[in-house]
Structure formats: structure tokens, C-alpha cells
């Protein structure tokens, strides 16, 4: 956002506390500063990740440890998320579902091959047959997915109704809206979806970083999903570059 959000221009601080209580300016003015290099990130990913999206169990566990040690929501964001989640999580068994639409359908290089809505619905039905879930929590950036799920599972589907969702092949991250603090809200909405998915008892989803984060947060709490189905259609290798 061009204006201050929660008193800051730092997008990380829109939602999170700084791990050590220092600001960016504090760090820049310190006598000794160590900066990470992109090459270090490449080495870590080659060692612990199968591809740009799929994590090894060891890598996920290491990230869960880091999350547990360093990552904290700020007071405002934590209160907002807790308040929003209480309407869905009321001691019912909840199956979380993440369906990624919009720009995933465009098939960009190094992005997951899009999961079809029919694939997701089929796996949800299988999970419902094997486990007792009273509710389905649906996290999606696609308007049509909400309509399909409500038709397939009437009275069972819950989702956040204030989420900005798209209809075409363009990422909602590039969307424009008249609502106040639109891009801050986009960040909050995906963060809230992630924490909601982490709070679910089961999970059906395709490959995505939102799902990776939910699994990391889940493990950091010392819990496991009763059922976990990650639909993996592979990664696009076609040279098509991501664009607005």
C-alpha cells in the first residue's frame, strides 16, 4: 500500500512481529551485519526440496522448527484471525480444502499443473467416506469453485465470504479494487486461509505455497492431519513466463 498500514510501510510488519524486536533501520545501523545471499537459498532448496513446490519431510520439519521459534503474528492480526476462525471451528470435525484457480490455469513455467475442480471434489468425497467430518472449509481464489462446492456438498461448505476472488486467468494479487487497503486485505485473506487450513482436521489440496505453509504451521503445533491428500499433477516445464 502507498499509505501506512498498522503504522508501517514494511509489508512483513503489516501482519507479523519482528523476530528479535529490531526494526530494519536498527539492523542497517548496526556495526556488524550479515546478509543472506540468493545462492544460499538455491543450495538449501537443492538439498531439501524435490522441486519448487514439493517439500521433503525433513525440510518441512526444519521449517516447522523455524516457524515455532521465530514467527509471531502481531497483536492486531492474531486477534482478527482468532475472531474470524471461531465461527468455523466450533469443536466440529473440519475437512480443509484448498483449490487454486485463476493464474494457475495459465500453466506458467515451474508452477504446478493446475488441479481440476473435478479432481478435488472426487478426493473430498473419498475423504468424507473414510472419516467423520461435519464441515468442509473451502479456501479458494476462484469464484466458480465456491459455487461448485456448494452444489456438490449443500449445507456442509464454509468459507470466508469477504475474500476477493477472481474469475479469469489473472492472479488476484494483480487485481484492482475500490475497497480500502485492497492489497493489504489480499495479504490478510490468504494468511487467514492458511491458518484456517492449518487448524483443520483433514486436508485435500493441490501443490501450492499456501498449503505448504499450512502444513508447516500444523507440524509446528505438534499435530497431524487425520487425513492428508495432496493432488500432484506435476510441474509445468514449458518456458511460459509468469506475467501480470
Task: Describe the function of each predicted region.
Residues 1, 96-98, 137-139, 158-159, ...:
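A structural signal for short, well-ordered beta-strand segments and their strand-loop junctions
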Residues 1, 102, 141-143, 208-209, ...:
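An acidic- and aromatic-residue-enriched active-site/binding cleft used to recognize and process polar
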Residues 1-126, 130, 134-135, 146:
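Secretory-pathway glycan-assembly enzymes, especially type II membrane glycosyltransferases
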Residues 98-104, 125-181:
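Catalytic donor nucleotide-activated moiety binding site of glycosyltransferases and closely related
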Residues 113, 179-184:
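Short, flexible loop segments at the rims of nucleotide/cofactor-binding pockets, characterized by
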Residues 187:
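Catalytic "initiation/cleavage/transfer" segments centered on a nucleophilic residue
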Residues 190-234:
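A donor-sugar binding/catalytic signature common to diverse glycosyltransferases
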Residues 230-244:
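Leloir-type glycosyltransferase catalytic cores
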Amino acid at each position: 500500500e502507498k499509505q501506512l498500514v498498522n503504522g508501517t510501510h514494511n509489508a512483513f510488519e503489516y501482519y507479523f512481529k519482528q523476530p528479535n524486536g529490531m526494526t530494519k533501520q536498527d539492523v542497517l545501523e548496526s556495526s556488524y551485519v550479515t546478509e543472506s545471499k540468493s545462492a544460499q537459498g538455491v543450495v538449501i532448496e537443492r538439498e531439501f526440496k524435490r522441486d519448487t513446490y514439493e517439500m521433503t519431510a525433513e525440510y518441512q520439519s526444519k521449517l516447522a522448527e523455524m516457524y515455532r521459534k521465530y514467527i509471531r503474528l502481531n497483536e492486531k492480526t492474531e486477534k482478527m484471525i482468532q475472531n474470524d476462525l471461531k465461527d468455523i471451528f466450533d469443536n466440529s470435525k473440519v475437512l480443509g480444502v484448498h483449490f487454486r484457480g485463476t493464474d494457475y490455469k495459465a500453466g506458467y513455467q515451474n508452477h504446478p499443473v493446475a488441479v481440476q475442480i473435478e479432481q478435488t471434489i472426487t478426493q473430498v468425497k473419498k475423504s468424507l467416506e473414510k472419516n467423520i467430518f461435519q464441515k468442509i472449509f473451502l479456501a479458494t481464489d476462484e469464484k466458480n469453485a465456491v459455487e461448485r462446492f456448494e452444489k456438490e456438498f449443500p449445507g456442509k461448505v464454509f468459507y470466508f465470504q469477504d475474500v476477493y476472488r477472481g474469475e479469469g486467468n489473472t492472479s488476484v494479487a494483480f487485481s484492482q479494487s475500490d475497497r480500502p487497503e485492497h492489497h493489504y486485505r489480499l495479504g490478510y485473506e490468504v494468511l487467514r486461509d492458511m491458518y484456517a487450513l492449518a487448524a483443520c482436521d483433514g486436508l485435500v489440496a493441490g501443490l501450492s505455497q499456501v498449503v505448504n505453509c499450512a502444513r508447516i504451521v500444523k507440524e509446528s503445533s505438534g499435530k497431524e492431519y487425520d487425513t492428508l491428500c495432496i493432488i500432484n499433477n506435476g510441474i509445468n516445464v514449458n518456458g511460459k513466463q509468469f506475467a501480470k
